[in-house]
């Protein structure tokens, strides 16, 4: 079928070592492996590095616009603040430029799988790709949230994709990464890829989204959040601050400026 007449979203699912999954015509990818302190691989601790943000605009190639950045972040926080059953420890998510930079590096490869492997030990990751007419970044993000229809809190008992070459059946790990209470930082990148290989098919033009999360979520055997009165179990570092049912950090904006 003509690529220009058919828009296809693909979400790639990766559990533990790289299975992929296809949910109808909406593929997405989620990755979570054992976590380790980011300082072990040269990242700054959760203090949000800003060195990349200080590079002059003329020297910095961007893989995402500020509008797309805000749309992704606002959508995540909207979803996180409205989980059911309600969360007692849901943390407000902020944009992290260091995570965005790692997402840039992977998006630029146009490889339809999770990576790079050395970072997947430390980060959560959701992927989405689309061919055909592209209207909005949320076309690539909303399918992650759509998985909520197959999710039974606290564990994804109904999510059991079958993965020979492609994966079929309900999946939930993109959604659970979105609403993992302690995953309070996200950074994403979007790239236009030409002749991208997606499960054996070559897409002449594909829009590829990579989102990295920290601290990573999707720990096996754990629920994404604790149930209870919103903000009743926030970490002490939040000082009791609560906004839209989420533990709210002492920040002046809900994202880290890409350029200062």
From Swiss-Prot:
Cellular component aspect of the GO annotation: extracellular space
Keywords: Developmental protein, Glycoprotein, Protease inhibitor, Secreted, Signal
Record has Glycoprotein as a keyword: yes
Location in or out of the cell: Secreted
Domain of life: Eukaryota
The SCP domain, residue ranges: 73-213
GO molecular function terms noted in the UniProt entry: peptidase inhibitor activity
InterPro entries found in the cross-reference section: Allrgn_V5/Tpx1_CS, CAP_dom, CAP_sf, CRISP-related
Stated family: Belongs to the CRISP family.
Designated name of the protein: Peptidase inhibitor 15-A
Organism (species): Danio rerio
Gene: pi15a
């Amino acid at each position: 079928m003509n690529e220009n007449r058919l828009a296809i979203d693909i979400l790639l699912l990766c559990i533990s070592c790289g299975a992929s999954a296809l949910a109808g015509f909406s593929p997405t990818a989620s990755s979570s492996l054992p976590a380790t302190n980011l300082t072990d691989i040269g990242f700054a601790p959760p203090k949000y590095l800003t060195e990349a943000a200080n590079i002059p605009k003329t020297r910095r190639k961007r893989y995402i616009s500020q509008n797309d950045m805000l749309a992704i972040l606002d959508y995540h926080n909207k979803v996180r603040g409205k989980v059911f059953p309600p969360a007692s420890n849901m943390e407000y998510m902020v944009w992290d430029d260091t995570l965005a930079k790692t997402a840039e590096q992977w998006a630029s490869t146009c490889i339809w799988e999770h990576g790079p492997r050395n970072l997947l030990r430390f980060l959560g990751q959701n992927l989405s790709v689309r061919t055909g007419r592209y209207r909005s970044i949320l076309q690539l993000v909303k399918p992650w949230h759509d998985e909520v229809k197959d999710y039974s809190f606290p564990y994804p008992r109904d999510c059991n994709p079958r993965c020979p070459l492609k994966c079929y059946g309900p999946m939930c790990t993109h959604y659970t990464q979105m609403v993992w209470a302690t995953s309070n930082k996200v950074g994403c990148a979007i790239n236009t890829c030409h002749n991208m290989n997606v499960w054996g098919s070559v897409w002449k033009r594909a829009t590829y989204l990579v989102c990295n999360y920290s601290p990573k979520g999707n720990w096996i055997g754990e629920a994404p959040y604790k149930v209870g009165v919103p903000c009743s179990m926030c970490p002490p570092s939040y000082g009791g601050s609560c906004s839209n049912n989420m533990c709210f950090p002492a920040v002046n904006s809900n994202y880290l400026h890409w350029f200062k």
